[in-house]
């Protein structure tokens, strides 16, 4: 995947309710973690399909994370996204 600069990516990420907050408030006990979620197709589809399971997606690159945010077209309380380098994941969990 070729990374492209997205103008205003940091502002979009900082304003989004799904990013880097509320992980400890997820509604379900069962949780799946996807490291390197890319543009989010897989994790968003599964969050819609399985509302009783939590999904946490991790992505390192702002421009890719913005593309995932743009695909969220409904309220998904069981989905959270982390803008994070997977090498530092132990600081979150």
Kindly give the residue locations of the regions a language model identified.
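A short acidic, Gly/Pro-enriched loop at the edge of an enzyme's catalytic core
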Residues: 92-93
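S-adenosyl-L-methionine
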Residues: 1-31, 41-48
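SAM cofactor-binding core of SAM-dependent methyltransferases
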Residues: 30-88
């Amino acid at each position: 995947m070729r990374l492209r600069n997205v103008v205003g990516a940091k502002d979009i990420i900082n304003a989004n309710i799904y990013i880097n907050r509320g992980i400890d408030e997820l509604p379900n006990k069962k949780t799946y973690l996807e490291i390197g979620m890319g543009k989010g197709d897989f994790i968003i589809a599964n969050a819609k399909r399985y509302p009783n399971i939590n999904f946490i997606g991790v992505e390192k690159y702002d421009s890719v994370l913005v593309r995932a945010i743009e695909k969220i077209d409904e309220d998904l309380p069981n989905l959270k996204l982390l803008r994070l380098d997977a090498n530092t994941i132990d600081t979150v969990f």
